[in-house]
C-alpha cells in the first residue's frame, strides 16, 4: 500500500515502511482515516443447553449466535467466545471482541480458573474427589489439578463443584464419568473473577470496563 502511495500522514504520502508512528492520528489509507485499536470489551452470556458454541453448524443445529442476535446490546462489536461449552452444558460463556484477551484467558499457563456445578448420579466420596487435586490420566490423556467438593447429596444423587484451570474437550464430564458418575446436568458458574450470578438464561450483560481493565492487568499475555 505504501509503494502505491495509498498511505498518508497528515496529508503527506508515506514513502517508507520505516516511518515512525507514535499513534494512528493523522494516518489515512485511500483517504479514509485509520481508527485506533478498539477497546477490549467482555460480555457475560448465560448459555442455555442445546446450543453449539460455534458461528455455524454443518448439521444445521442452533448456535450461540442464534440466541445472541436479540440478546446483545445494539452497536456491539463482533464477539468471539472465550473457550467453549458443549452442546448440553449451560451457564457462563464469556464473549469478547479482543483476540488477545480471548487467547490469554484460554491458555492453561495463564491459570484462569473455571468453576462448574455438576448434578450426578452414583457413588463417590469426598476423598475420591480430593484425589483429583493431583490430576488424573484417562485413556492416555492427562488432566491437571482439579479442586472438587461434594456440595449436596440426596441418596445417590449429588451436586459436585469443580474448579480447574484448563479447558480440554469434555474434561469435566470425562473426569466424573471416570469416577463412575453419570452427569445429568453441567453448569459453568464462573470463569476467573466473572460469575454467572443471577443472569437469566439467554441474557447478556457487559462486564464493567474498569473491572475488565483490572483483570487484564494481571494477565501475562493480554495487558491493556
What is the meaning of each model-derived region?
Residues 1-224:
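Basic, flexible Lys/Arg- and Gly-enriched helix-loop patches that mediate nucleic-acid binding at interfaces
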Amino acid at each position: 500500500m505504501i509503494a502505491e502511495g495509498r498511505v498518508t500522514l497528515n496529508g503527506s504520502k508515506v514513502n517508507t515502511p520505516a516511518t515512525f508512528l507514535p499513534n494512528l492520528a493523522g494516518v489515512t489509507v485511500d483517504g479514509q482515516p485509520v481508527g485506533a485499536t478498539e477497546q477490549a470489551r467482555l460480555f457475560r452470556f448465560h448459555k442455555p443447553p442445546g446450543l453449539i458454541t460455534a458461528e455455524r453448524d454443518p448439521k444445521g443445529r442452533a448456535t450461540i449466535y442464534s440466541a445472541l442476535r436479540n440478546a446483545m446490546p445494539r452497536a456491539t462489536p463482533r464477539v468471539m467466545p472465550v473457550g467453549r461449552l458443549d452442546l448440553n452444558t449451560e451457564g457462563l460463556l464469556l464473549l469478547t471482541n479482543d483476540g488477545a484477551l480471548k487467547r490469554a484467558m484460554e491458555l492453561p499457563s495463564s491459570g484462569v480458573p473455571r468453576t462448574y456445578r455438576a448434578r450426578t448420579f452414583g457413588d463417590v466420596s469426598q476423598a475420591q474427589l480430593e484425589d483429583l487435586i493431583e490430576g488424573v490420566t484417562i485413556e492416555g490423556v492427562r488432566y491437571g489439578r482439579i479442586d472438587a467438593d461434594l456440595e449436596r447429596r440426596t441418596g445417590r444423587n449429588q451436586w459436585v463443584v469443580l474448579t480447574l484451570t484448563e479447558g480440554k474437550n469434555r474434561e469435566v464430564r470425562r473426569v466424573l464419568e471416570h469416577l463412575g458418575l453419570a452427569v445429568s446436568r453441567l453448569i459453568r458458574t464462573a470463569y476467573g473473577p466473572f460469575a454467572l450470578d443471577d443472569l437469566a438464561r439467554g441474557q447478556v450483560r457487559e462486564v464493567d470496563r474498569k473491572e475488565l481493565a483490572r483483570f487484564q492487568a494481571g494477565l501475562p499475555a493480554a495487558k491493556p
